[in-house]
A protein has these predicted regions:
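Active-site-proximal loop/turn and secondary-structure-junction residues that shape catalytic pockets
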Residues: 13-15, 38-42, 78-80, 123-127, ...
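Flexible, glycine- and charge-enriched loops at secondary-structure boundaries
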Residues: 47-54, 93-98, 129-136, 166, ...
Length: 276
């Protein structure tokens, strides 16, 4: 039986393919959705012709699935788009987050043009010169402006807990949502592999806790000991349980495979992971 959610695949697993070639592969395999990571090598949000690229992408997505169209979520985890020397910097918890804020605004604009289900983003690793309270204050100060920007364009945001970042667990994400007033435009992304590493209640507990706000899901395998995205069967994830839990909580969004370090096997990995 077809699940209520849409199975997708992340373009960050196709770093050696042109974007439209990657979409063709995913369409041939039979995916219902695409998790589009902005930045190198596929869609530079700051490029002079980015608008033309987005228009072409929208048309390509509409042709997928036999013309019924593929769903899309926008991911913003590109490593060196904003700073060529420091991965992911600046983030929302840095002292100066001007570039990050503008990047997320561009992500919202592109998501609006694509009718994307959401824009997913992370908090960031706390810099050495900041205390946790500083980081939380920066998030509370900055996220409302992003929420307003997204809301004006009909776009939903989803904060992703990441191992080692200030917002690391679903409980952290729930605290953040509460701190900014539970705006309807702000939800949560859950990466099921991350749950093995940092969630006290495991994957199922995290998904159920996030359920009222769950806007985006990333699927991958992972060891319990550290943050390493792996293909299914190479870690400790109970994938049937994950899919059953998503169905049980009534999740209807995108659940996309996230294998950012497997571009070397891009044509093979989606086929192996398809219809997990």
């Amino acid at each position: 039986m077809k699940p209520p959610f849409l199975l997708g695949y992340g373009t960050n697993g196709f770093g050696d393919h042109p974007l439209h070639s990657a979409l063709d592969v995913l369409d041939d395999v039979g995916y219902d959705a695409v998790a589009l990571t902005l930045g190198f090598p596929h869609l530079d949000p700051f490029a002079p012709l980015a608008g033309d690229d987005v228009t072409a992408l929208r048309a390509h997505l509409a042709r997928m699935r036999g013309g019924t169209g593929a769903a899309v979520v926008v991911e913003t985890g590109t490593r060196y788009l904003l700073d060529p020397l420091h991965k992911h910097r600046p983030t929302l918890v840095d002292r100066d987050a001007t570039l990050r804020m503008r990047y997320l605004e561009r992500a919202v604009e592109i998501a609006a043009d694509l009718d994307a289900r959401c824009v997913s983003f992370f908090s960031g690793i706390l810099p050495d010169d900041a205390a946790p309270a500083d980081g939380w204050a920066r998030l509370r100060d900055r996220i409302p402006a992003l929420v307003e920007y997204a809301g004006e364009r009909g776009v939903r945001l989803a904060v992703e807990p990441e191992p080692g970042m200030l917002v690391e667990t679903v409980d952290d994400a729930l605290r953040l949502l509460a701190d900014v007033g539970l705006p309807p435009e702000l939800g949560i992304t859950v990466d099921v592999g991350h749950c093995l590493v940092v969630e006290p209640g495991g994957v199922e507990g995290a998904l159920r806790a996030a359920a009222p706000y769950l806007s985006n899901v990333q699927l991958d395998d992972m060891p319990r000991t550290h943050h390493e995205h792996r293909p299914f069967g190479e870690g400790a994830i109970d994938l049937p349980m994950v899919l059953a839990t998503l169905a049980d909580i009534g999740y209807t969004g995108v659940a996309a495979v996230e294998l950012p370090r497997h571009s070397h096997d891009a044509p093979g990995s989606p086929s192996t992971a398809a219809r997990p």
